[in-house]
Structures are given as structure tokens and as C-alpha cells.
């Protein structure tokens, strides 16, 4: 699991959309930054950190800085994926809980939101009218959405989110003595 102790603090470098009509094989390289790939169509066969994967439509993959990655087989048919290069101010770490960003290295999007936000990031990065901060905010939103999808899929809900949900129940519904317990409050 890729983790960060704090939100924000991301340096965005560039992003784009690779499209190939067939026989694409990812070149062998080592990047000094993080790479995030999100597949729109087709399948990308790639090795990174000694692990071979076939990344299909609707799936994402993080490639770590300093690790060699390369294609392991040519693509069949059309291939299209979005990619972004970035670095955090505070290095990501391997961990599991208590982190602002909690990102599996590889996963499947459970909604269309990931693709929509990623396209916004690519679009913002291509327009000169946007500030650097706006592009970094789009990247933050993408990583936050990936984190939220992961937490939702694991059935884990951070304490502040549980508290917010309980507050909504109080605001829109009836008050119950069980609400503080649902938010994780433990009486003395």
C-alpha cells in the first residue's frame, strides 16, 4: 500500500493520453517520479518491481520512482490510457492505516469518477490559462478519490467520516444515544 501522512504537497510534472492502434509495447525506463496509469481501453502488459501485470480497461497502476518498468508483450487492438507524472513533497511510504492517501499500487475503479477526474487533470495540464496550483489540486482530487474508493472497498471508514455521517443523521433524523458510539466515541 502506498501511503502519505498528509494531503497536498504534490508536484505535478505532466500528463497525457497515450493511444495506439495496435502492437504497442511500453519502452524500458526508470523514472525519477511517480507515474500513475489509468486504462481507458485495451490491455497493457507491463512489469514493474519484478511484478508482471496485465492492466485492463478501468484499472490503474502506480509505478514507483527509481524502479525499472517495461512492457512485456505487444498490445492487441486499440490501447488507450491516461498517465501522469508527479512527486510528493513528503515521500510516500509503505503502510496501511492512519494515512491521508492510502493507495493500492494496482486496482480497479469502482465508478466512472476516476476517469472523469483524470481527464480533468489532463485537460487542465494542457491549457496555459490554468495556474500550477489548479493542476496540483486536480491531482490531489484524483489521489483522494482513489483513496476513498479503496477505503470504501475495504469497508473502512475514517473516524472523521463516521462522525460526519452521524452528524448528518442528527441533522436530518432523530437523535439517539447510539450515535456517539457509532462515531467511535467511548464513554469513560
Label every PLM stretch briefly:
Residues 95-160, 166-173:
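Amphipathic alpha-helical segments enriched in hydrophobic/aromatic residues interleaved with Lys/Arg
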Residues 11-100:
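N-terminal regulatory/effector-sensing and dimerization cores
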Residues 172-188:
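Basic/polar phosphate-binding segments, predominantly the helix-turn-helix DNA-binding elements
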Residues 20, 44, 126, 151, ...:
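Generic structural signal for secondary-structure transition and capping sites
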Amino acid at each position: 500500500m502506498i501511503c502519505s501522512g498528509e494531503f497536498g504537497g504534490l508536484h505535478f510534472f505532466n500528463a497525457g493520453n497515450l493511444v495506439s492502434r495496435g502492437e504497442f509495447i511500453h519502452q524500458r525506463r526508470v523514472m525519477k517520479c511517480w507515474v500513475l496509469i489509468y486504462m481507458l481501453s485495451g490491455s497493457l502488459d507491463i512489469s514493474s518491481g519484478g511484478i508482471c501485470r496485465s492492466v485492463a480497461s478501468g484499472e490503474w497502476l502506480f509505478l514507483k520512482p527509481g524502479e525499472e518498468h517495461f512492457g512485456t508483450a505487444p498490445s492487441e487492438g486499440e490501447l488507450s490510457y491516461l498517465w501522469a507524472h508527479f512527486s510528493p513533497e513528503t515521500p510516500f511510504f509503505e503502510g496501511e492505516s492512519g494515512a491521508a492517501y492510502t493507495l493500492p499500487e494496482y486496482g480497479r475503479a469502482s465508478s466512472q469518477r476516476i476517469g472523469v477526474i483524470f481527464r480533468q487533470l489532463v485537460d487542465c495540464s494542457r491549457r496555459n490559462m490554468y495556474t500550477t496550483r489548479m493542476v496540483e489540486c486536480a491531482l490531489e482530487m484524483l489521489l483522494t478519490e482513489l483513496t476513498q474508493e479503496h477505503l470504501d472497498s475495504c469497508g473502512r471508514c475514517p473516524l472523521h467520516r463516521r462522525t460526519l455521517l452521524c452528524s448528518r443523521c442528527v441533522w436530518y433524523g432523530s437523535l439517539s444515544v447510539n450515535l456517539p458510539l457509532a462515531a467511535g466515541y467511548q464513554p469513560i
